[in-house]
Amino acid sequence: PAWVCNKMNNALDADWFRGLGAGESAGQFTVELPQGWQTVETPVQFPVCKDRTPAWVQYVQSRRLEVTCGEAPFLASRYDAATGEMIPVARRIGILDRKLRVVSENAATEDEWRKYATHAVQSTYGYEYQGDNLLLARVNLLLTYAEHLQARWQRKPTKEELQPIANIISWNLWQMDGLHRSVPGGKPQPEAEQLDLFSMFGAAEPQPPTVSCKVKNWRKGSHGTAQNFETIQEGSTSMKFDYVIGNPPYQ
Protein backbone atom coordinates (compact mmCIF):
# COMPACT_ATOMS: atom_id res chain seq x y z
CA PRO A 1 0.00 0.00 0.00
CA ALA A 2 1.10 3.58 -0.67
CA TRP A 3 0.87 4.51 3.01
CA VAL A 4 3.47 1.84 3.83
CA CYS A 5 5.76 3.17 1.08
CA ASN A 6 5.32 6.67 2.52
CA LYS A 7 6.18 5.51 6.03
CA MET A 8 9.33 3.69 4.89
CA ASN A 9 10.47 6.53 2.61
CA ASN A 10 9.96 8.93 5.53
CA ALA A 11 12.31 6.77 7.60
CA LEU A 12 15.00 7.01 4.89
CA ASP A 13 14.62 10.77 4.67
CA ALA A 14 14.72 11.21 8.45
CA ASP A 15 18.03 9.33 8.54
CA TRP A 16 19.41 11.36 5.62
CA PHE A 17 18.53 14.70 7.22
CA ARG A 18 19.98 13.59 10.57
CA GLY A 19 23.24 12.92 8.75
CA LEU A 20 23.36 16.62 7.86
CA GLY A 21 22.67 17.63 11.43
CA ALA A 22 19.27 19.04 10.51
CA GLY A 23 16.63 19.84 13.11
CA GLU A 24 13.33 18.01 13.49
CA SER A 25 11.47 20.57 11.37
CA ALA A 26 13.67 19.89 8.33
CA GLY A 27 12.91 17.31 5.70
CA GLN A 28 9.20 16.89 6.33
CA PHE A 29 7.33 15.83 3.22
CA THR A 30 4.26 14.34 4.90
CA VAL A 31 2.56 13.88 8.25
CA GLU A 32 1.78 10.22 8.80
CA LEU A 33 -1.80 9.19 9.57
CA PRO A 34 -3.22 5.72 10.34
CA GLN A 35 -3.01 4.02 6.92
CA GLY A 36 -2.57 7.36 5.19
CA TRP A 37 -0.73 10.68 5.19
CA GLN A 38 -1.21 14.41 4.92
CA THR A 39 1.10 16.31 2.58
CA VAL A 40 3.11 19.16 4.10
CA GLU A 41 2.27 21.96 1.67
CA THR A 42 5.07 24.34 2.64
CA PRO A 43 8.44 23.88 0.88
CA VAL A 44 10.72 21.21 2.31
CA GLN A 45 13.27 22.81 4.64
CA PHE A 46 16.98 22.06 4.20
CA PRO A 47 19.89 23.04 6.45
CA VAL A 48 22.45 25.55 5.20
CA CYS A 49 25.69 23.89 4.07
CA LYS A 50 28.50 26.44 4.05
CA ASP A 51 31.19 26.06 1.38
CA ARG A 52 29.50 22.88 0.12
CA THR A 53 26.97 21.79 -2.44
CA PRO A 54 23.53 23.06 -1.34
CA ALA A 55 21.69 20.49 0.77
CA TRP A 56 18.75 20.31 -1.62
CA VAL A 57 21.10 19.40 -4.48
CA GLN A 58 22.74 16.72 -2.32
CA TYR A 59 19.28 15.30 -1.64
CA VAL A 60 18.37 15.23 -5.32
CA GLN A 61 21.67 13.47 -6.13
CA SER A 62 21.45 10.91 -3.30
CA ARG A 63 21.57 7.41 -4.83
CA ARG A 64 18.65 5.22 -3.83
CA LEU A 65 17.76 1.70 -4.95
CA GLU A 66 14.54 -0.30 -4.77
CA VAL A 67 15.27 -4.04 -4.82
CA THR A 68 12.92 -6.53 -6.50
CA CYS A 69 10.99 -3.41 -7.41
CA GLY A 70 8.01 -4.83 -9.28
CA GLU A 71 6.12 -1.76 -10.54
CA ALA A 72 8.44 0.45 -8.41
CA PRO A 73 5.93 1.74 -5.81
CA PHE A 74 8.74 3.06 -3.58
CA LEU A 75 10.28 5.01 -6.47
CA ALA A 76 7.18 6.41 -8.16
CA SER A 77 3.76 6.73 -6.52
CA ARG A 78 1.55 7.58 -9.49
CA TYR A 79 -1.07 5.22 -8.05
CA ASP A 80 -1.59 3.09 -4.98
CA ALA A 81 -0.30 -0.35 -6.00
CA ALA A 82 -2.75 -1.99 -3.58
CA THR A 83 -5.92 -0.32 -4.93
CA GLY A 84 -5.00 1.13 -8.34
CA GLU A 85 -6.26 4.56 -7.22
CA MET A 86 -4.42 7.44 -8.92
CA ILE A 87 -2.54 9.86 -6.65
CA PRO A 88 -2.33 13.57 -7.58
CA VAL A 89 1.17 14.89 -8.24
CA ALA A 90 1.08 17.16 -5.18
CA ARG A 91 0.38 14.17 -2.87
CA ARG A 92 2.93 11.71 -4.23
CA ILE A 93 5.46 10.18 -1.88
CA GLY A 94 7.81 8.08 -4.04
CA ILE A 95 11.57 8.57 -3.97
CA LEU A 96 11.64 10.17 -7.43
CA ASP A 97 8.50 12.17 -6.62
CA ARG A 98 10.21 13.65 -3.56
CA LYS A 99 13.34 14.52 -5.51
CA LEU A 100 11.30 16.21 -8.26
CA ARG A 101 9.24 18.09 -5.68
CA VAL A 102 12.47 19.47 -4.20
CA VAL A 103 13.67 20.47 -7.68
CA SER A 104 10.37 22.25 -8.37
CA GLU A 105 10.60 24.13 -5.07
CA ASN A 106 14.21 25.25 -5.57
CA ALA A 107 14.95 25.59 -9.30
CA ALA A 108 14.45 29.18 -10.45
CA THR A 109 14.30 28.56 -14.21
CA GLU A 110 13.09 25.83 -16.50
CA ASP A 111 16.64 25.08 -17.65
CA GLU A 112 17.72 24.66 -14.02
CA TRP A 113 14.69 22.47 -13.39
CA ARG A 114 15.53 20.15 -16.27
CA LYS A 115 19.18 19.94 -15.17
CA TYR A 116 18.43 18.83 -11.63
CA ALA A 117 15.41 16.76 -12.61
CA THR A 118 17.82 14.79 -14.80
CA HIS A 119 20.12 14.35 -11.78
CA ALA A 120 17.10 13.11 -9.82
CA VAL A 121 16.39 10.41 -12.40
CA GLN A 122 20.08 9.49 -12.66
CA SER A 123 20.24 8.80 -8.91
CA THR A 124 17.07 6.65 -8.77
CA TYR A 125 17.63 2.92 -9.34
CA GLY A 126 15.72 -0.35 -9.20
CA TYR A 127 16.01 -3.93 -10.38
CA GLU A 128 13.39 -6.59 -11.07
CA TYR A 129 13.44 -10.21 -12.21
CA GLN A 130 10.16 -10.27 -14.16
CA GLY A 131 10.28 -8.45 -17.48
CA ASP A 132 6.62 -7.40 -17.52
CA ASN A 133 6.93 -5.76 -14.09
CA LEU A 134 10.13 -4.05 -15.20
CA LEU A 135 8.34 -2.51 -18.18
CA LEU A 136 5.63 -1.08 -15.90
CA ALA A 137 8.28 0.32 -13.55
CA ARG A 138 10.08 2.07 -16.40
CA VAL A 139 6.83 3.54 -17.72
CA ASN A 140 5.94 4.76 -14.23
CA LEU A 141 9.24 6.61 -13.84
CA LEU A 142 9.06 8.18 -17.29
CA LEU A 143 5.48 9.38 -16.71
CA THR A 144 6.46 10.62 -13.26
CA TYR A 145 9.07 12.89 -14.83
CA ALA A 146 6.59 14.10 -17.46
CA GLU A 147 3.81 14.76 -14.94
CA HIS A 148 6.04 16.72 -12.57
CA LEU A 149 7.32 18.84 -15.46
CA GLN A 150 3.74 19.56 -16.52
CA ALA A 151 2.70 20.39 -12.95
CA ARG A 152 5.59 22.86 -12.56
CA TRP A 153 5.72 24.47 -16.00
CA GLN A 154 2.18 23.88 -17.35
CA ARG A 155 3.33 22.10 -20.48
CA LYS A 156 4.03 18.59 -21.65
CA PRO A 157 7.62 17.54 -22.35
CA THR A 158 8.66 17.18 -25.96
CA LYS A 159 9.83 13.92 -27.49
CA GLU A 160 13.36 15.36 -27.64
CA GLU A 161 13.25 16.08 -23.90
CA LEU A 162 11.91 12.64 -23.00
CA GLN A 163 14.43 10.67 -25.08
CA PRO A 164 17.46 11.18 -22.78
CA ILE A 165 15.30 10.60 -19.70
CA ALA A 166 14.03 7.34 -21.17
CA ASN A 167 17.63 6.32 -21.87
CA ILE A 168 18.62 6.96 -18.24
CA ILE A 169 15.64 4.96 -16.98
CA SER A 170 16.44 2.05 -19.29
CA TRP A 171 19.86 1.82 -17.60
CA ASN A 172 18.78 2.55 -14.03
CA LEU A 173 15.89 0.09 -13.93
CA TRP A 174 17.30 -3.21 -15.07
CA GLN A 175 16.45 -6.91 -15.10
CA MET A 176 18.44 -8.94 -12.59
CA ASP A 177 18.33 -12.11 -10.53
CA GLY A 178 18.96 -10.54 -7.14
CA LEU A 179 20.02 -13.82 -5.51
CA HIS A 180 22.89 -14.33 -7.95
CA ARG A 181 23.41 -10.71 -9.08
CA SER A 182 23.24 -11.82 -12.71
CA VAL A 183 20.88 -11.52 -15.64
CA PRO A 184 18.00 -14.03 -15.31
CA GLY A 185 19.46 -17.42 -16.17
CA GLY A 186 22.95 -15.90 -16.21
CA LYS A 187 24.26 -18.18 -13.46
CA PRO A 188 24.04 -21.77 -14.75
CA GLN A 189 22.71 -24.19 -12.16
CA PRO A 190 24.74 -27.39 -11.72
CA GLU A 191 23.03 -30.49 -13.00
CA ALA A 192 22.45 -33.37 -10.64
CA GLU A 193 24.88 -36.20 -11.36
CA GLN A 194 24.99 -39.80 -10.25
CA LEU A 195 28.24 -40.30 -8.34
CA ASP A 196 30.32 -43.41 -8.75
CA LEU A 197 33.59 -44.59 -7.25
CA PHE A 198 35.71 -43.21 -10.07
CA SER A 199 34.07 -39.83 -10.65
CA MET A 200 34.29 -38.96 -6.95
CA PHE A 201 38.03 -38.41 -7.29
CA GLY A 202 38.04 -36.84 -10.73
CA ALA A 203 38.49 -33.17 -11.51
CA ALA A 204 35.33 -31.10 -11.30
CA GLU A 205 34.06 -29.82 -14.61
CA PRO A 206 34.56 -26.07 -15.01
CA GLN A 207 31.39 -23.99 -14.76
CA PRO A 208 30.65 -21.26 -17.29
CA PRO A 209 31.09 -17.74 -15.89
CA THR A 210 28.16 -15.82 -14.46
CA VAL A 211 26.73 -13.20 -16.82
CA SER A 212 26.83 -9.95 -14.83
CA CYS A 213 24.46 -6.99 -15.18
CA LYS A 214 25.76 -3.68 -16.43
CA VAL A 215 24.55 -0.46 -14.83
CA LYS A 216 25.44 3.15 -15.64
CA ASN A 217 27.44 5.17 -13.14
CA TRP A 218 26.32 8.67 -14.13
CA ARG A 219 29.00 10.32 -12.00
CA LYS A 220 31.76 9.08 -14.31
CA GLY A 221 32.19 10.55 -17.76
CA SER A 222 30.05 13.12 -19.53
CA HIS A 223 27.45 10.50 -20.46
CA GLY A 224 28.00 8.05 -17.63
CA THR A 225 30.09 4.90 -17.60
CA ALA A 226 28.70 1.37 -17.92
CA GLN A 227 30.02 -0.90 -15.18
CA ASN A 228 29.24 -4.33 -13.80
CA PHE A 229 26.76 -3.95 -10.95
CA GLU A 230 29.26 -5.39 -8.47
CA THR A 231 31.91 -2.77 -9.27
CA ILE A 232 29.89 0.42 -8.78
CA GLN A 233 31.22 2.23 -5.74
CA GLU A 234 31.76 5.71 -4.36
CA GLY A 235 35.37 6.71 -3.68
CA SER A 236 37.32 4.09 -1.77
CA THR A 237 34.23 2.50 -0.21
CA SER A 238 32.22 -0.42 -1.52
CA MET A 239 28.92 1.43 -0.93
CA LYS A 240 26.91 1.55 -4.15
CA PHE A 241 23.85 3.41 -2.87
CA ASP A 242 23.02 5.74 -0.01
CA TYR A 243 19.84 3.78 0.72
CA VAL A 244 18.31 0.49 -0.35
CA ILE A 245 14.60 -0.15 0.12
CA GLY A 246 11.98 -2.70 -0.86
CA ASN A 247 9.06 -4.77 0.32
CA PRO A 248 9.70 -6.28 3.78
CA PRO A 249 11.88 -8.08 4.69
CA TYR A 250 14.18 -6.44 2.10
CA GLN A 251 14.28 -2.90 3.53
Language model region names:
Residues 1-251:
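SAM-dependent methyltransferase catalytic region
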